[in-house]
């Protein structure tokens, strides 16, 4: 199960993990905050 981060403006979902962290320059804690701020919890 991968928890994705949904960016409404882009309409894309990215799995959390090292690749996402490198791409966005975010750490897991930041992604956690982003998920709650966006209000999206996607399961893939």
UniProtKB/Swiss-Prot annotation:
Induction: By water stress.
Keyword Hydrolase (UniProt): yes
Keywords assigned: Glycosidase, Hydrolase, Stress response
Catalytic reaction list: Hydrolysis of terminal non-reducing beta-D-galactose residues in beta-D-galactosides
GO MF terms held by the record: beta-galactosidase activity
Uppermost EC category: hydrolase
Record carries keyword Hydrolase: yes
Organism: Pinus pinaster
Recorded family membership: Belongs to the glycosyl hydrolase 35 family.
Note: On the 2D-gel the determined pI of this protein (spot N76) is: 5.8, its MW is: 32 kDa.
EC number(s) given by UniProt: 3.2.1.23
Name of protein: Putative beta-galactosidase
Source species taxonomy: Eukaryota, Viridiplantae, Streptophyta, Embryophyta, Tracheophyta
Disulfide bond entries: none
């Amino acid at each position: 199960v991968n928890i994705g981060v949904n960016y409404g403006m882009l309409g894309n979902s990215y799995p959390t993990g090292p690749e996402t962290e490198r791409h966005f320059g975010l750490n897991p804690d930041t992604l956690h905050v982003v998920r709650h701020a966006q209000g999206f919890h996607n399961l893939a």
